[in-house]
Amino acid sequence: MSFRHTSVMPDQAVALLNCEKGKIVADCTLGGGGHAVRIAEQILPEGLLIGIDKDPAALAHAKQALSVFGERVLYVRGNFADFSEILSSLDIPAVDGVLLDLGLSFYQIDGSGRGFSFRKDEPLDMRMDPDQSLTAADLVNQSAEADLVRIFREFGEERYASRIARRIVEARRSAPVTTSGQLARIVTDAYPAKERHTAKIDPATRVFMALRIAVNTELENLERFLDTVIDRIKPGGRICVLSFHSLEDRMVKRRMKLWEKACVCPPGLPVCSCSKQRECRIVTRKALVPTAEEVQANPMARSVRLRAAEKV
């Protein structure tokens, strides 16, 4: 299957980056290159675009989409969590703009064959980086029941985490759970009968999201990225983040507020002792959301939140 993906909120995200000719911009989740093409059109040929992705299929497609821009685009197969190290390896001290899109591509969900979708019956894999060893099947079949409860509750905010974990443990006593279809049926059966057909989202939605987050250490990666990225942005440069669930969005919102603070001393101290300097100005006081028209055209955009900050 060819790589298919529609970038979410591309015009708003690229506009917030303040792209201009000659700037250096990093797209830390290159995907199919939808955002990157728009960025490249605005900063090249004088500027430089750095495209990072750990999925080799995404990188291959992006290289085709961006081939017209030639050597002014640098491609890096890597994890956005290692952004600072990647810049060091390229001998680039700082950039003018950073874009991070935390969503899955349509290809990953529908065409990768890695079990991201509960609507398909595929190997229960869920790795964004196929070279990684841990799979969703490993977690489902080897984790203790208590650990499954924690994963579903912490990463999926799933109210029936205990019931679902118990059903999984019961099912795997007979045979390993190896496909996305198997897991989806187990989760649906674990739900109270009255809620299976009345819930606004499919019963398997939160469990699949939780497993994907756990397999790919998504929240840990985001934390590592946020720990260092602001130091790699030039004064006046901007960072834009597209989050697709509340856990990510809360992390980004809190970190931007922390960057904006000039002092983080406990309240009541007569004199500041932390010596913290204000690092950014928040550009989006309230997260931007897609229009109803975009959601209708691209349902994957439904939950996205876009936040931006400017380095001072």
From Swiss-Prot:
This is Ribosomal RNA small subunit methyltransferase H. The keyword rRNA processing applies. It catalyses: cytidine(1402) in 16S rRNA + S-adenosyl-L-methionine = N(4)-methylcytidine(1402) in 16S rRNA + S-adenosyl-L-homocysteine + H(+). Keywords: Cytoplasm, Methyltransferase, rRNA processing, S-adenosyl-L-methionine, Transferase. InterPro entries: RsmH (IPR002903), SAM-dep_MeTrfase_MraW_recog (IPR023397), SAM-dependent_MTases_sf (IPR029063). SUPFAM superfamilies: Putative methyltransferase TM0872, insert domain, S-adenosyl-L-methionine-dependent methyltransferases. It is found in: Cytoplasm. The lineage of its organism: Bacteria, Pseudomonadati, Thermodesulfobacteriota, Desulfobacteria, Desulfobacterales. It is an enzyme of class 2 (transferase). Belongs to the methyltransferase superfamily. RsmH family. Specifically methylates the N4 position of cytidine in position 1402 (C1402) of 16S rRNA. S-adenosyl-L-methionine binds at residues 33-35, 53, 80, 101, 108. GO terms for biological process: rRNA base methylation. GO terms for molecular function: rRNA (cytosine-N4-)-methyltransferase activity. Gene3D superfamilies: Putative methyltransferase TM0872, insert domain, Vaccinia Virus protein VP39. Pfam families: Methyltransf_5 (PF01795). It comes from the Bacteria. GO terms for cellular component: cytoplasm. Its EC number is 2.1.1.199.
